[in-house]
Amino acid sequence: MKPSWFPCLVFLCMLLLSALGGRKNKYYPGELLLEECWGQPKTNDCVKKCSRTFKCVYRNHTCCWTYCGNICAENGKFFERK
C-alpha cells in the first residue's frame, strides 16, 4: 500500500464514523426533570415504563419515579401528596 493512500483511508474512516453516528438531540434543562409519584403504584402501574428521555407513549400520562423505577402514571393519580 502506498503512503499516499493512508491519509485518504483515514479521512474515509473518519467520514464514515461521523456519518453513522448521526446528530444528537439537544434537550432543554427542564425537559428531563422527573416528579415523584406520591402514592403506592400497583404492579400493573409498574409495567408502564417511561422512555429514556422520560416521555410516555400513553395519552394523559406523565413520567414519574417510584420504588419500581420510572413509570408513566395517569395525570392526577399519584401526584397529590397524601
From Swiss-Prot:
Protein's cellular compartments: Secreted
Keyword terms, alphabetized: Secreted, Signal
Keyword Secreted (UniProt): yes
A cellular component term, taken from the record's GO annotations: extracellular region
Major subcellular location class: secreted
Signal peptide span: 1-21
Keyword Signal found: yes
Other comment: Although this protein was isolated in a region containing several WAP proteins and was defined as a WAP protein, it does not contain a classical WAP domain.
Protein name: Protein WFDC11
Taxonomy of the source species: Eukaryota, Metazoa, Chordata, Craniata, Vertebrata
